[in-house]
Amino acid sequence: MSQDDFPAPASGFVVTHFLVVSDQDRSREFYRSVFGATVLLERDPVILRLANSWLILNVGGGPTDDKPTVTLTTPPDPNQTSAFLNLRVADIAAAYADWSAKGAEFLT
C-alpha cells in the first residue's frame, strides 16, 4: 500500500473509523461488494477507502505494552453494539434498494 493511498491530511484531521470484526475477509468483501469500497490493504488490518473516508477492519487484540488496560473485541451478543456507521445518501430509497439487493441488512 502506498502512502498516497492513505494520506495524512495537509492540515486539520481526518476521522478514520476502526471496526473490530470477527472475520476480516468476510467484512472486507461486504464493504467492497455492497458499498464499492476500494481495498487498500487486504488484512492485518484491512484498510478500505469508502466514499470520502477510510475504514480500518481488524480482529480484536490487546492489551499491549502501551495500553495495558485496553482490549479490543467484538460484542459478545450480535444484537448489542457500541458503534455503528451512519451513511448519509442523496436518495435513501435508491440506496436501500441497491444495498439490500447486494446483501445489506438494515435495522430500520
Locate predicted features:
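Conserved active-site tyrosine of GNAT-family acetyltransferases
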Residues: 27-32, 99
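Generic non-transmembrane alpha-helix signal with a bias for helix starts/N-cap capping motifs
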Residues: 24-25, 92
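Conserved beta-strand-loop-alpha-helix junction that forms the acyl-donor binding cleft
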Residues: 18-24
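Vicinal oxygen chelate
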Residues: 1-15, 38-108
